[in-house]
Amino acid sequence: MTRVKRGYIARKRRKKILAFVSGSRGAHSKLFRTANQRKARALVSAHRDRGKRKRDLRRLWITRINAAARANGVSYNRFIQYLYKRQLLPNRKTLAQIAVLDSNCFSTIFNNLSYDEIG
């Protein structure tokens, strides 16, 4: 059987993985086997946390809108319900930014909804 020397291809593959985990501590950045496991774990965490970030930001936006709505005397739930009944589909990210950066504008939006005729 002919001898196969993998030469630079194997070295290139290992270097790529070691470069990926270069920020790790100890053997995880030096030894190929542990580095390979660390890379797999990092990719799993990155994939999971991309979804988690979306959930966390939505929770933050809802909290901010709730605080601003309660400052005007209505809960978040009622405020969103009124928006839907007026067929104003809320973008929570934008509403949260308005609530934080320009509370007068949020109050204007809030006061333009007539709560009596809906509820």
Curated annotation (Swiss-Prot):
Record has rRNA-binding as a keyword? yes
What's in the keyword line of the UniProt record? Chloroplast, Plastid, Ribonucleoprotein, Ribosomal protein, RNA-binding, rRNA-binding
**Where is it located?**
Plastid, Chloroplast
A GO cellular component annotation here is:
ribonucleoprotein complex
Record keyword Chloroplast present: yes
Which organism does this sequence originate in?
Answer: Pinus thunbergii
Classification via Pfam families: Ribosomal_L20
Which family is it part of? Belongs to the bacterial ribosomal protein bL20 family.
Look up the record and give one Gene Ontology term from the biological process aspect.
translation
Query: So which domain of life are we looking at?
Result: Eukaryota
The cross-references to PROSITE patterns, in alphabetical order and at most eight, read:
RIBOSOMAL_L20
Q: What is this protein called?
A: Large ribosomal subunit protein bL20c
